[in-house]
């Protein structure tokens, strides 16, 4: 699973996800992409599940690009621990995704296979998404 090799600080504030994506809203690598419509934190496990769903459906043909990286630490306290006594330890890593962000790109497969692969990937994610296609010049 994806996670940073090292970070400047171990823990972060929760923060909020406001506004639209400033960058990463266009297709850069592939012909088909999966674009977020809602703001949400996507965990490394969800990214990996979506990647596996796509590559399995494509039968390891074509190419997949993951355009988001889980760089936000999410902390959690152990089960049945009372409130207080400091912040919990890092439990998982997540990527903050704003509306309009392209999360995955696909190339090297035909239209039907690409759309179905992205639909399967979208089912693994906790947000509404849209399949986008690069217009040929």
From Swiss-Prot:
CDD domains: Ribosomal_L16_L10e. InterPro entries: Ribosomal_uL16 (IPR047873), Ribosomal_uL16_bact-type (IPR000114), Ribosomal_uL16_CS (IPR020798), Ribosomal_uL16_dom (IPR016180), Ribosomal_uL16_sf (IPR036920). SUPFAM superfamilies: Ribosomal protein L16p/L10e. Transmembrane segments: none annotated. GO terms for molecular function: rRNA binding; structural constituent of ribosome; tRNA binding. Keywords: Ribonucleoprotein, Ribosomal protein, RNA-binding, rRNA-binding, tRNA-binding. Pfam families: Ribosomal_L16 (PF00252). GO terms for biological process: translation. GO terms for cellular component: cytosolic large ribosomal subunit. Part of the 50S ribosomal subunit. HAMAP family: Ribosomal_uL16. Belongs to the universal ribosomal protein uL16 family. Binds 23S rRNA and is also seen to make contacts with the A and possibly P site tRNAs. This is Large ribosomal subunit protein uL16. It comes from Roseobacter denitrificans (strain ATCC 33942 / OCh 114) (Erythrobacter sp. (strain OCh 114)). The gene is rplP.
């Amino acid at each position: 699973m994806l996670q940073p090799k090292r970070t400047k600080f171990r823990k972060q504030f929760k923060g909020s996800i406001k506004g639209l994506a400033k960058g990463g809203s266009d297709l850069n690598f592939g012909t088909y992409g999966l674009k977020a419509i809602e703001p949400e934190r996507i965990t490394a496990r969800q990214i990996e599940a979506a990647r596996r769903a796509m590559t399995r459906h494509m039968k390891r043909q074509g190419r997949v690009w993951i355009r988001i990286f889980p760089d936000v630490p999410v902390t959690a306290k152990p089960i049945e621990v009372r409130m207080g006594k400091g912040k919990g330890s890092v439990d998982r890593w997540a990527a903050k995704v704003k509306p309009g962000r392209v999360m995955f790109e696909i190339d090297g497969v035909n239209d039907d296979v690409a759309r179905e692969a992205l639909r399967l990937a979208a089912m693994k994610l906790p947000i509404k998404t849209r399949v986008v296609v690069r217009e040929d010049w």
